[in-house]
From Swiss-Prot:
It comes from Homo sapiens. GO terms for cellular component: extracellular exosome; nucleus. This is Putative ubiquitin-conjugating enzyme E2 N-like. Signal peptide: none annotated. Belongs to the ubiquitin-conjugating enzyme family.
Length: 153
């Protein structure tokens, strides 16, 4: 494996030394470009409150010129996450900038988790329900959180 760029080493050291509240991110023992991430649903009144959501984050060889790849590993009912657990977040697509860091990506995912954006959907069936019957969509999201995200502590 190629030597890790200094930037990735520094970002990883900072993540481990100064963890973001509600987020745990650790590099894999065998691949320092692959991170095991757990983000807690902490926002009051969020349907994801109390859940712990696992993700995987992969830094491509081109990082930071290319955005990290992020996928949910915990099933979630969210308009910005599709059935393949891919996430729709502008900074992971057309708004990516090499000035952004892993920490920024994780904070943005945490914010999106707590405040879904139906105007940038990835899961059309979920966003349809979110727009036509938000109360039912929120209840479904709470049920999925209880079912899939509260069983691992």
């Amino acid at each position: 494996m190629a030597e890790l760029p200094h930037r990735i080493i520094k970002e990883t050291q900072r993540l481990l030394a100064e963890p973001v509240p509600g987020i745990k991110a650790e590099p894999d023992e065998s691949n320092a470009r692959y991170f095991h991430v757990v983000i807690a649903g902490e926002s009051k009144d969020s349907p994801f409150e109390g859940g712990t959501f696992k993700r995987e984050l992969l830094l491509a060889e081109e990082y930071p010129m290319a955005a990290p790849k992020v996928r949910f590993m915990t099933k979630i009912y969210h308009p910005n996450v599709d059935k393949l657990e891919r996430i729709s977040l502008d900074i992971l697509k057309d708004k990516w900038s090499p000035a952004l860091q892993i920490r920024t990506v994780l904070l943005s995912i945490q914010a999106l988790l707590n405040a879904p954006n139906p105007d940038d959907p990835l899961a059309n069936d979920v966003v349809e329900q979110w727009k036509t019957n938000e109360a039912q969509a929120i209840e479904t999201a709470r049920a999925w959180t209880r079912l899939y995200a509260m069983n691992s502590i």
